[in-house]
Amino acid sequence: PKINIVTLAMIVPVTMMHMHVVQMDLKREAAREKVIEIIEKHPRMGLVRKATGITSTAELKEYAMDMGRSRSDLWENGIFEDSVSCLGKELYLFQAIHQEADVVVENIDCIRAMIGTEKDPARSVAMTNKALNFVAL
């Protein structure tokens, strides 16, 4: 599908991660609650909720460590729930990306697709997530 996505990188103090400001042009207007519901159901997106008290990427990495993640890896996009906003057909959000870890799961899925061992992307994602005991934030 053709999706017009614009991302901007910002200079902020971060620890082993980087932040994106994401702006998407949607096909139709969306409600913030519906977008959050979609994010919650996606196996590779996690919501960083205000209730966690997380205000930085360093705290997010520590949270992953507390969850028992190997090397405190964050395989999902850490989307700050309070940043999700919709304006007409535009969606905005901030996401934290652990550049050392987010590519791991995607590469595993890509290898399966390239060699043809799994044709269904959703099934490949589920297999990888299960092998890593990975449940998104």
What is each model feature region?
Residues 1-101:
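C-terminal substrate-binding/catalytic lobe of Rossmann-fold NAD(P)-dependent oxidoreductases
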Residues 92-137:
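Generic C-terminus detector
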